[in-house]
Amino acid sequence: MREIVHIQAGQCGNQIGAKFWEVISDEHGIDQSGTYHGDSDLQLERIDVFYNEATGGRYVPRAVLMDLEPGTMDSVRAGPFGQLFRPDNFVFGQTGAGNNWAKGHYTEGAELIDSVLDVVRKEAEGCDCLQGFQITHSLGGGTGSGMGTLLISKIREEYPDRIMETFSVFPSPKVSDTVVEPYNATLSVHQLVENADEVQVIDNEALYDICFRTLKLTTPTYGDLNHLVSAAMSGVTCSLRFPGQLNSDLRKLAVNLIPFPRLHFFMIGFAPLTSRGSQQHRALSVAELTQQMFDAKNMMCASDPRRGRYLTACAMFRGRMSTKEVDEQMSMVQNKNSSYFVEWIPHNTKSSVCDIPPKGLKMAVTFVGNSTAIQDMFKRVSEQFTAMFRRKAFLHWYTGEGMDEMEFTEAESNMNDLVSEYQQYQEATIDDDADDMVNDY
């Protein structure tokens, strides 16, 4: 029931995805060969959300792995959980997209896309009642951004009524991995605005900050960053996988979080953030969790929620706790900080409570917020985009793959529209429309 097909695209997507499967397998008591070694029936009760039971009681992830070069796939296959995946579900090319969105979306990616869709179709057909798709990818490179968005639009055509959720790694403000990031990201956002249902915005810099500041790691690796992301990813779907007092799923999340169809870019956070060794020593209360979860330092993307207002927010608690306390804490946060929530959506937080906490913790919470502050992120990318596009720098790499400059201009204006929409709703108050209505008569 309620299965989710997981897709990972490009190097970043595959590395986050691999970590995610480690976390999920751990929660469900599945070892590296796919055999169940858990200690509770609850782990098996709804394991079919992410796993398919194969012959001999092996559990196989409903995962599709794709990339335009074999390197990352090989390291996933050689990694700790590499033997878990279905060998046919690794789809890769040999050429690589070379950080070029056009290669991923129009040339190299377009050649590979049909074989990816075949695998996706096969996974979807193996589901009783498909809830939707979740995709991990980055927007700065070529494959995850170009081919990832191509796949999203193809899946959209074929499964229009299924939820499409993406975990998208945006380019960071100060650290850049690729010079052409602003181009790739802007072209991708152009696609995500139209074709995705919910986009969880992640950003390496914010993750590094969490590792330095909160976890006190001196030299965080990508493994540490991806561990943070997968903790939050596991929290988003925990209500589907474990029994709880108050459930949420991808569709409920979408309905509660998206007031206007284009504004579906969310900040995610996770609490408690404790370094790996020190988890066991103190139990947190619901109050502390709530406080930590709304803290700007907890957000996995580099926009400060205090610079905008929350249109909506959703908190997914995990562990044994009283729902009454959860409700009280959530409404207390809203009353205390009412200026940070738009007043024209009363009660704009949703909470859910799932009984099973993540491994090693007594209680935890995943936070998903739809805040107007996310416009900072788009503004930043857009400024970098404009600076390069004005000089037509690096454009020949894209036009050489058959792209048109028009497409860049469209993507740019779509992103700027998005920013001004967020700005408009940030400033809107209840009284705005009242005046307009008087004028209508």
Swiss-Prot record:
Q: Please report the name of this protein according to its UniProt entry.
A: Tubulin beta chain
- Tell me yes or no: is GTP-binding among this UniProt entry's keywords: yes
Q: Does the keyword GTP-binding apply?
A: yes
* Family the UniProt entry places it in: Belongs to the tubulin family.
Q: Which residues bind Mg(2+)?
A: 69
* Binding-site residues for GTP, renumbered to this chain: 11, 69, 138, 142-144, 204, 226
This molecule's function is given as:
Tubulin is the major constituent of microtubules, a cylinder consisting of laterally associated linear protofilaments composed of alpha- and beta-tubulin heterodimers. Microtubules grow by the addition of GTP-tubulin dimers to the microtubule end, where a stabilizing cap forms. Below the cap, tubulin dimers are in GDP-bound state, owing to GTPase activity of alpha-tubulin.
Q: Which InterPro entries match?
A: Beta-tubulin_BS, Beta_tubulin, Tub_FtsZ_C, Tubulin, Tubulin/FtsZ-like_C, Tubulin/FtsZ_2-layer-sand-dom, Tubulin/FtsZ_GTPase_sf, Tubulin_C
> What is the species listed in this Swiss-Prot or TrEMBL entry?
Babesia bovis
Per its record, what are the GO molecular function terms?
GTP binding; GTPase activity; metal ion binding; structural constituent of cytoskeleton
Q: Name one GO cellular component term.
A: microtubule
Q: Where in the cell is it found?
A: Cytoplasm, Cytoskeleton
| Taxonomic superkingdom | Eukaryota
